[in-house]
């Protein structure tokens, strides 16, 4: 039998049938939130259809939920309608939903793994581009469009073309203060936001194996920002130990059989990839984006690049436009860039490990006077409860950070948390596009430690200086 990649194994084991170069694949887990599901539920109602497999669906409101006082509900009428519609649809169709006020409520890509609803070997879909997060478990996970959401609800299947396979190997040991977020940004800086287009990426190598599940989720979350369809990491003891005992994990009598299968979920020796990228872990430093695309990124001790030195005219004009939007001058040291707001949260970096890293930097310090708002938004009610049990909320509050309720928050301008025009934000989210965090807002993507460091310094600063 020929050697297979992890992607081959996951894709091939879910093919129902193939014709004309496309495959009908079976979907094991369907995660749902309030933004991309109402049209799908409406379509089912109009056609008189039921959900094909209701126990495969798990729903949670996240994009529109307020992160401040929830006792008065949701102020914005459109946001409120989306969340209420999800509640009603879940009641009508018998779907399990973790509603606002439930401690399990949170960002869909934090909630799924936390509940053990994401398991190795699964196909996982959600009407959300950052579904690639779940690939950290040795699963095939990707975002789908709203019409596909309805298709999966009705048939449990999806028509897919098989992607090419790329392996990104990160060998060596990451330095202190260098995180999975820095690895993700460094990779995107190297291959570009189109570097992974048409590929499913497997992240491998000793540096990846040494990451926690939280770190692996951060990395796979950003695979989509490299243009990839999916990101994934092979199963090992770290994966299995994380899943064990979670509410949706296999029960004790099925556990050994599940683990035996999960241990096969890695690329075989000699498996052929369509592309291989190699990066040395020691070369990666804390990263900061300077432009309006995740590929516009550099190390903290570097400078804002000069478009006049770029020979490609298309790239040059893109850089010029980005610098104009961001209000930055070429050759400015990154550490000289002052900030107005700090956002620690999102499906990229709102898990307990992320909050611990930020708290370690903030402890005993205070948010700088020029920073108007520094906010910490846990990824779920359970993450929030654990952080409070560990006293992290006290560290943040004493340092002048706001401690919020779980949700997508300032990752995107779809709720009350947003930037005003011209405001500059150090953000642990995943996209720095124009207007992503609010019209005219300027986003710099960083790790949680780097965001906390920027909050206390009032400008970007090498987090390693504060950790020494």
Curated annotation (Swiss-Prot):
MF terms (GO), sorted A to Z: 3-isopropylmalate dehydratase activity; 4 iron, 4 sulfur cluster binding; metal ion binding
Residues bound to [4Fe-4S] cluster: 347, 408, 411
Cofactor binding annotation: Binds 1 [4Fe-4S] cluster per subunit.
E.C. number(s) listed in UniProt: 4.2.1.33
Catalyzed reactions: (2R,3S)-3-isopropylmalate = (2S)-2-isopropylmalate
This protein's pathway: Amino-acid biosynthesis; L-leucine biosynthesis; L-leucine from 3-methyl-2-oxobutanoate: step 2/4
Family matches, as Pfam families: Aconitase
GO BP of this protein: L-leucine biosynthetic process
Keyword Nuclease among UniProt keywords: no
Domain of life per record: Bacteria
Annotated keywords: 4Fe-4S, Amino-acid biosynthesis, Branched-chain amino acid biosynthesis, Iron, Iron-sulfur, Leucine biosynthesis, Lyase, Metal-binding
Swiss-Prot/TrEMBL cofactor(s): [4Fe-4S] cluster
SUBUNIT field: Heterodimer of LeuC and LeuD.
Described purpose of this protein according to its UniProt entry: Catalyzes the isomerization between 2-isopropylmalate and 3-isopropylmalate, via the formation of 2-isopropylmaleate.
Entry's family note: Belongs to the aconitase/IPM isomerase family. LeuC type 1 subfamily.
Protein name per the record: 3-isopropylmalate dehydratase large subunit
Organism: Methylobacillus flagellatus (strain ATCC 51484 / DSM 6875 / VKM B-1610 / KT)
Gene field: leuC
